[in-house]
Amino acid sequence: ALNLSMTLNNGSFNSSDFSGNLNITIPMGSNTVTSTIQILNDGNNEGDENMKISLAAVPSDYVILNNNITIRVHDINFVVQPWGSPIHPTYGLCPRNIPTGYYSTLEGKSGQALRQAIQDIIANPNSVRVQNYGDAYNVLKEADQNPENSGQVWMIYDEQPISKIDYQTDNSIIGKWNREHIYCQSRLGIPSSFIPNSIPDGINNWRLTTGSADIEASHDDTHHLRAVGGQENSTRNNRNYGVDYNGPSGNIGSWRGDVARAIFYMAIRYTSLNVVNGDPASSPTGQIGDLATLLAWNTLDPADDFEMNRNNVIYNWQMNRNPFIDYPALVNYVFGNLTNSTWNAALSTADFNQKTPTIFPNPAKNQIAISGLDQLSNLEIYTISGAKVANYLVLNESQLDLNLPSGIYLVKITSDTVSTTKKLIIE
């Protein structure tokens, strides 16, 4: 007979997570044995874990050919948030945790004065913290958490979740997620002498001084770091948005407004960074495009609860917020066609999403109806690449006959100065 013993413990997976006999015997004349291991529900939200089957040493006349087998154990005690994922967006369910008076110095300003006032807030050396790069994974596990399963993060371009524990730890990116720099790392202009600190030291440890000229801080700034599939991160590389990179085949563009607002934040937070029209080369550094595309994406993919939660989480770590998530309309006052207009937050907070305009049926075939409108509105339909294919004036309960090919479209409904964008599927 051959007596075998094994262990299953691996990291946080331990004896409280299973029951069963770990000492087994293969009888003389047999070559198999079975032992039943029961996975236990300990009632704790620990996230997914890996159980590792490891055999202890065997007699010298035996050779172990297969050992240290890892098996994924999914935690059923995950938490579900009240808001949706980026592909099922919700609006107004996640609170905007903006400190009182945080944006008060922006009021009544325009042009360069407004731009400087924003920078004075988000690059304030007296309050803004710089965490090290090793902490970024921990920040993203919280900030990019899948609202539908707290054991997962949401991958930005891939538009799907992945277990938090599947982050990249070595050179392999297959089946792993890692940290995407929205404003490409090679475009930041960080000195070659800079060596990021990859050892996490927690939320209570940060670099004491920073400012708008502190370009090294841009490497670790989680306002533009996102969880992403390792392979798609490599595919994006340092390509400009819109004119070159538009995501993997078949994506519905749920991330496009997110990257636009992250780029706009970076172009204000760091003096040496700019967002420009076209497809700029990666050298000289400090330029990324395409501005026209990103302005359109900011409108077509409005800030949702997922982004607002990100903003809240990152503020807890860095003590600064992305103002273009809190006030997406601010983008046009800084980068768009309202640079000569005076900013007034009270006139920009009317959230059209709260009026809950509804398009039905969705998916649709050749006809849709609009409800939830309280005044005459303009309705525009765009392809997922941003080309406008239809335009209508609509009232509440309007019915529209469409003649569109099958696919995914963005429907922008505008009333006065506020707007909302909905995704529409044509079968």
Residue ranges and their predicted role:
Residues 156-168, 336, 343-344:
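Long, His/Glu/Asp-enriched segments that create or flank divalent metal/ion-associated functional microenvironments
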Residues 350-427:
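C-terminal outer-membrane/trafficking sorting elements
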Residues 60-61, 70-94, 336-355:
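Low-complexity, Pro/Thr/Ser/Gly/Ala-rich linker/spacer regions in secreted
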Residues 78-163:
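N-terminal module-boundary/linker segments of secreted carbohydrate-active enzymes
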Residues 1-79:
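Short boundary segments that mark the start of a structured unit
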Residues 171-345:
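Domain-level detector of nuclease and nuclease-like folds
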